[in-house]
Amino acid sequence: MQKTLKPLRLPQETATLDNGLRVVVHEDRSSPIVAVHIMYHAGSKNERVGRTGLAHLLEHLLFEGSENCPKGQFDRLLERVGGTNNGSTWLDRTNYYEVVPSHAVELALWLERERMGHFLPVLDEEMLDVQRSVVINERKQVYENRPYGLAYETLQRLLFPEGHPYSWPTIGYTPDLEAMSLQDASDFYRRYYAPDNAVLVLAGDVGVEQGFEWGARYFADLPANGGVRPSPAANGAGTGGGTQVLEDRVSFPRIYHAYAVPPYGTEAWVQLDVLSYLLADGESSRLQQTVVRDAELAQDADTYLYPTELAGIFGIVTTARSGVPTERLAAAVDQVVERVVQDGVSEDEVTGAIRRARRDHINAMASVEDRAEELAYAATVLSDAGRLDEILNQYERVTTDDVRRVAREHLGIDRRATVVVVPRREDGHGQ
């Protein structure tokens, strides 16, 4: 088999300030814009039982102003120069970014300096109460009141043992959010919002030396907090916690399978990603050919693989056609995976899956904003932005034996958590 693929490379240079902040610069002069991206090595996994949702709530609070930038001024300043900004929280990290014309980079850096070093003086009970309500409403709208909205948090709770840092959702639980105190928020901020727990990426129309100089100018005098590292000590392995059925306001049953697998950055993770594409991406993929098209058991079939730090999470999701029992669909999905284990896969299948995976990785780095986030994530969870190139170029080395092996080792039924979402009986539907 010939898999002569051009190596993928995302050029970058990294410097580390005396206070521990890593500054990564990716130069791309094709457009006069720059993405300024700050990522903190703290997400929902750094919370504790009883205070879930704290990382995400703090992200909301950190858009409410700072000591030298009053509430509302942050967005107004960026709008004046034609910039945009946003942030997000996930299991392993929290990130903030601005995309600005290249002449406005220093404004974005000053704003992020304010967020990192000058937030606590403005944090008060009123701000906390307002944002707590916003997040609780977000939970209701996005999860509790949306069809299938509670499936993934239930799946995480089944897959990982009680108290594991991945066992609760990033949005948190409402009772925990209601119990959150000002002290909780300030303690989390002090512990994790420090230069030695952050990565700054400048991507776009900026030179490497200029980027390093700006990073030092705006952040070098902010104090480190003593080499803080993410706190979870839990084993990354999941428990494969059985099956749970949820009734919801949905028209069709949906089956969610999840497996705890090796973490992002390992060769096995890349091999599992190829397996993911082979199973469900494209008309020629195994699940599309069998359960969707030939057997007509499912309306759709999808897979996913989270690039997470303590353990990867591999998922298979299928939506049943009208009248198809969930037991029959689940058995068909199991049979597809078992055939990979027993009979292996073809070189053509693996080559196609690799090419589709590379296509998606390339598309995911189309903008400087996307590239900044990818570099920041690699620098955060793998400790080196340069590891991104290494991972991207591992794909073409994946073999048929690799795919068969990781399916056998990591996708066993005994290692799996399953959530089945079915229509509520009062809706007049059955399985």
PLM-predicted stretches and their roles:
Residues Q2-L5, L120, P161-E162, T170, ...:
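An aromatic/glycine/proline-enriched structural segment found at the starts
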Residues K3-P32:
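N- or domain-start disorder-to-order transition segments that initiate the globular core
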Residues V24-H26, S31-S44, G53-L57, K71-H118, ...:
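M16 family metallopeptidases and their MPP-like homologs
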Residues N46, E64-N68, G117-E126:
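Short, polar/flexible loop-turn hinges at active-site or ligand-entry regions and domain interfaces
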Residues T52-S66:
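Active-site SXXK
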Residues Y189:
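Conserved, carboxylate-rich catalytic/transport cores that coordinate ions
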